[in-house]
Swiss-Prot record:
Keywords: Amino-acid biosynthesis, Metal-binding, Methionine biosynthesis, Methyltransferase, Transferase, Zinc. Belongs to the archaeal MetE family. Zn(2+) binds at H201, C203, E224, C285. Its cofactor is Zn(2+). It comes from the Archaea. GO terms for biological process: methionine biosynthetic process; methylation. This is Methionine synthase. Pathway: Amino-acid biosynthesis; L-methionine biosynthesis via de novo pathway.
Length: 308
């Protein structure tokens, strides 16, 4: 079974330490987030994860994109849409993905181990933002589709940068406030034309949305099961075998490190429903809020449980 992560990892940016870094800082070229990316890559590699992330160290999942996309801005920590949504001049995440890939290739030449490209989904971007201009805040469909057009370009940038797969994060889809038909059209628009696997991450209770999600044109549905064991019942009831399942099997809301046996038993329950060959083993969600030691230990036990 392939092991992966959902995205964020608890490493911190740091200031310049070496002479070379201080010189870069003097000339305005030092990137304080690169040490955090390198630390995230090394931790995930040491834990044995197959498809890693760059750690998503530059900020929260909405703000990082909103700060770069035309027609959006951040005020007092809130994402605001003030004009028509347009693409940035370049990629938002390709440089970090390439850097993470370079670090990984320095650790191993095993091409089965790669870096996933991650984008925050169009519905989550729009519903997490305050609309102050151009779009109707009571009818967000147009904004969602314009955002999908921007994110389709970003997904292609990430693919061209060497991403092993593309993950679209859509936590808002389980909340009940999103128009699922529009959400599906937006996701399908992003996925169309990509040559690598596309995974859709939706955390939360999937009881009212799984039937819709199964119709989306993605290769993998990434869902949480450790923190929401009731999702297993929903999966068993509604599953049809035309997609992979990203199987969240460690709880990212608690510092408690699950034992290998506990994780293994949960994975077995998932395999009994969808088949071991359809499982991608990962945490429930991002790990940003966990202590680094707990995050690493959870990943290590997860990988060992998946391999035994």
């Amino acid at each position: 079974m392939i092991t992966t992560v959902v995205g964020s990892y608890p490493t911190e940016p740091r200031g310049p330490e070496t002479l070379g870094e201080r010189l870069l800082n003097f000339f305005g070229s030092y990137d304080r987030y690169r040490p955090a990316i390198e630390a995230a890559v090394r931790d995930q590699f040491r834990a044995g994860v197959d498809i890693i992330s760059d750690g998503q160290v530059r900020g929260d999942m909405v703000g990082h994109f909103a700060a770069a996309i035309g027609g959006m801005k951040i005020e007092d920590g809130t994402s605001i849409i003030y004009s028509r949504i347009t693409p940035p001049a370049g990629s938002i995440g390709a440089a970090d993905l390439r850097y993470a890939y370079r670090i990984l290739r320095g650790l191993t030449d095993d091409e089965s181990r790669g870096v996933k490209g991650i984008i925050t989904g169009p519905s989550t971007m729009i519903y997490a933002s305050r609309i102050e201009g151009f779009y109707d805040p009571q009818k967000r469909d147009r904004a969602v589709m314009d955002m999908a057009g921007v994110l389709k370009i970003e997904a292609k940038h990430l693919q061209d940068a060497g991403a092993a797969m593309i993950q679209i994060d859509e936590p808002f889809l389980s909340t009940g406030i999103v128009d699922m038909k529009t959400a599906g059209r937006a996701i399908d628009h992003i996925a169309a034309g990509l040559d690598i696997e596309v995974s859709l991450h939706v955390c939360g209770d999937i009881r009212n949305v799984l039937s819709d999600l199964l119709r989306f044109k993605v290769d993998v549905l990434d869902l949480e099961f450790a923190g929401r064991p009731s999702n297993l019942e929903v999966l068993e009831e509604k599953w049809r075998g035309d997609k992979g399942v990203g199987f969240g099997c460690v709880d990212t809301t608690t510092e408690r490190v699950e034992s290998m046996e506990e994780i293994r038993n949960l994975i077995k329950r998932g395999a009994d429903i969808v088949g071991e060959e359809n499982l991608y083993i990962d945490p429930d969600c991002g790990m940003r809020k966990l202590p680094r030691k707990a995050a690493f230990s959870k990943l290590r036990n997860m990988v060992m449980a998946a391999g035994n």
